[in-house]
Amino acid sequence: MCLSKSFIEIYDIEVLRNCFLYLGIDTKSNQIIEFVIFGARNDLRALCRHLRSLKGQIGFNNLNYDSQVCQFILNNESTWLELEYIADQITEEIFKFSQETINRENVFLKYSEYKLYCKQLDLYKMHHFDNRGKVQSLKGLQCNLNFKMCLESPIDFNSSITEDQLKLLVGYCKNDILSTKAFFEHDDTKKEIELRKGLAKSYDLPYNSINWSNSKIGSELILKFYCEATNKNPKEVRKERTERTHINLKDCIP
């Protein structure tokens, strides 16, 4: 079932060789919803119906991973149903795509942000945690937030699980979405979101600018102002960039 039509939820997924788990929490009602593909339980239809009903999702590194896997599932739903795939066959396909997505991360994505099933807010990207100097995991964030529990996965994600281990996995995933929710509601995050909303409205930035880091917002605004002043096309200006393997500081500083 779906919680309601066109709502926004905070979510996380777990992918193992023989199990797919999706947990989401409604940002308004705090109701948690669960979908599982494992053993005798196959929530594929309900999961896809739920994903198509969403107005937006909030996660941590969800642009590069969670939303990619969910889009893959949506794209293959009809084929799996037509071929009457059982849960083990579906999870095998999902696990394979999950590994491919992890291996291609930071190179290119299978599905661009504009082609995803709903809008995404990625707290990981917005706070620029994908920068080498600021890199932060959700577990590290839980510690920094003094969250009530900082849990490491009780299961090897490259393994298959048992029925008893599924309960542990659900508890682990639930802790992740609750800590993501706490970070979403943190004052620092609220300020960053309001800043981006204001800039997007004032300067007609695209909706996905909410996921831009502060430095990217600055560079995009400079490009916008420059193109408006020179009447140049932003795509053409980007092509004029000089590729450099190194910079001699003595040539830059007098």
Specify the residue positions occupied by each region the protein language model found.
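Two-metal-ion RNase H-like nuclease active-site motif
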Residues: 6-15, 120-122
